[in-house]
């Protein structure tokens, strides 16, 4: 049985840096203590356990200031501290994301000076202050070459110049992956997604409030709710294996998360996980309900509720702030492009609230939803992400 524990995230890689530090969602999340568990050693099938595979041309712990000269089959994009800790727990049986662990990875700094002028919020992030876009780490899953990339740039926090986009394009051009996976926490859209469930999809939509002068197509895509698509055939053999054998390992942690809310007023809609969370795959076993199997990526923090107050329910099944931006970046590359997938876990479900009284302002409505959802995210973000990490392994193992 996994042991329940609590860990404290290090200062870097805050998910709510810059203008989002005072958002109602962030304030609620930051008041909570994130529940974590210590996973048992995982028995991987068919010799498919992840194993480190250092770059041949770079010493572990070195800073890569020029182009990466080695290629991979899969590039996995990671965003927040708790998200990478959960994936590391699954992939390496060691969730630590300490300064020492970061120094054992490879700092990615190619062309930092070129892009520095368009990066806002450098002083809010230790890695950016050190001239690093993020950290990369190579490993193998069977015969599949994988590179993990923990980005310190985020679409929602580093300004309307969107430095995240050219850096992703540069990294993809150097590594030449066949598949890019963007993964981590998300909010559930619709009533069928519960905490810990995972959605794997090759479709995304942008949902933006800001204008991006350098990327006017983003404004148009968002305004028209245009679907970004590619065609990825997921061999679900090991995804199904993960759903059958691995997602149940998150249940002790999810039970502890639920206990944090069992007696809180206003959270009766939150359901206790009575069975292993589901992994839904677009085109294989879609999420029940009318919502399209899309990831909806906003440049602000969004929440679905039973009144569809933010109009998300016609757009997708999960909402985040990253994936569609990454996929837009990939789609704009010339020549051969990699396929891409969003693999997201629900860290908070649809919020269920009574009808708001007449005269309630839109801001009051959204802040109420964010306060409820942000608290759930704050508690559940680690334990739910274990399941998207299992799903990532399943997709990679099936290649």
Please state what every model-predicted region is.
Residues 2-370, 379-399:
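Intrinsic-disorder/coil detector with helix-boundary
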Residues 374:
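Short glycine/proline- and acidic residue-enriched helix-loop micro-motifs
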């Amino acid at each position: 049985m996994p042991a329940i524990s609590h860990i404290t995230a290090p200062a870097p890689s805050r998910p709510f840096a810059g203008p989002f530090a005072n958002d109602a969602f962030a304030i609620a999340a930051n008041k909570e203590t994130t529940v974590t568990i210590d996973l048992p050693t995982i028995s991987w099938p068919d010799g498919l356990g992840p194993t480190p595979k250092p770059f041949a041309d770079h010493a572990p712990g070195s800073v890569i200031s020029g182009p990466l000269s080695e290629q991979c089959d899969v590039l996995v994009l990671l965003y927040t501290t708790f998200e990478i800790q959960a994936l590391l727990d699954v992939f390496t049986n060691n969730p630590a994301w300490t300064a020492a662990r970061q120094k054992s990875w490879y700092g990615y700094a190619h062309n930092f000076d070129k892009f520095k002028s368009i990066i806002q919020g450098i002083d809010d992030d230790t890695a950016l202050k050190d001239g690093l876009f993020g950290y990369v780490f190579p490993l193998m899953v069977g015969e599949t070459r994988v590179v993990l990339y923990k980005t310190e740039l985020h679409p929602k926090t580093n300004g309307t110049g969107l430095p995240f986009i050219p850096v992703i394009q540069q990294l993809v051009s150097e590594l030449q992956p066949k598949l890019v996976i963007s993964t981590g926490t998300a909010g559930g859209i619709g009533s069928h997604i519960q905490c810990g469930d995972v959605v794997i999809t090759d479709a995304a939509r942008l949902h933006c409030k800001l204008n991006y002068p350098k990327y006017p197509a983003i404004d148009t895509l968002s305004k028209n709710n245009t679907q970004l698509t590619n065609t990825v055939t997921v061999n679900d053999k090991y995804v199904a294996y993960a759903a059958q054998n691995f997602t149940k390992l998150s249940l002790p942690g999810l039970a502890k998360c639920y206990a944090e809310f069992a007696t809180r007023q206003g959270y009766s809609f939150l359901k206790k996980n009575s069975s292993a969370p589901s992994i839904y795959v677009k085109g294989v076993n879609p999420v029940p309900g009318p919502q399209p199997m899309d990831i909806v990526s906003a440049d602000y923090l969004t929440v679905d509720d039973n009144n569809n107050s933010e109009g998300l329910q016609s757009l997708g099944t999960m909402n985040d702030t990253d994936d569609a931006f990454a996929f837009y970046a990939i789609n704009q590359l010339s020549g051969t492009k990699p396929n891409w997938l969003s693999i997201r876990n629900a860290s908070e479900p649809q919020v269920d609230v009574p009808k708001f009284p007449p005269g309630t302002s839109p801001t009051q409505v959204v802040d109420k939803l964010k306060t409820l959802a942000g608290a759930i995210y704050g508690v559940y973000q680690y334990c739910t992400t274990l399941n998207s990490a299992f799903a990532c392994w399943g997709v990679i193992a099936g290649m």
